[in-house]
Amino acid sequence: PFTFRDAGKIVGYDVDLAALMCSSLGVKPEFIDTQWSGVIPALYAGRFDVIMSSMSYRKERLEKVAFSIPYAEASQAMLIRADDASKIMSVKDLSGKVLGVKLGSPGEMMKPALEKEIVAAKGTGFSDVKIYDDHPSAYLALSQGTVDGVLNTLPTLGKVMKDRPGAYALVRPVGKLNWAGIAARKEDTEIVNWMDSELSKLKDSGEIYALQEKWFG
């Protein structure tokens, strides 16, 4: 629900929030669809001015970009089939099972640490890790039994469960509590200051929480 295509149009929480922020300037934001793996190089190449796509705070990213204050929770959780809820109660229970992740996502980056944790607890890690170009493909694989768990942000998976009641269950927490911010080039301090100011105003007015209720439930 952060950013996705609906009938070819880019929509979502990020889109609505960006529109609210830009309304104070009397302009409409332009959205450029970009491969996640190359999004930071594209930012510095000047293809766009900010990255607004549920980007979580990570050490390696903080070295490359400047972040706004948080605008959403970005902690990871794991989606499983509802029928497996009594058998998979933590990530460690995915020992000997198949994990699904999106290419270049925080979930993929967490895989080595999770594998190490599972091996330490159970003696055996994942039987396989399948990597998908997008999360909907991973959810479909979960429904079909190709994978046993899919990693994504907690707010996003909450929306997935809301849309298909009774089909899925959640395993959380996975890793540490984390937050998403809007990223800009390090030298663009004026943009970062503006983003922080707008986000603070929208938090104070409650508008940002109304958007979260709309998209995340």
Give names to the regions the model predicted.
Residues 3-5, 18-27, 107-131, 161-165:
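Ligand-binding cleft/hinge of the Venus flytrap
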Residues 1-54, 194:
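Extracytoplasmic small-molecule ligand-binding "clamshell" domains
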Residues 32-37, 46-58, 74, 81-82, ...:
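Beta->alpha turn/N-cap motifs
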Residues 38, 55-63, 110-117, 136, ...:
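A ligand-binding cleft/hinge motif common to bilobed small-molecule-binding domains
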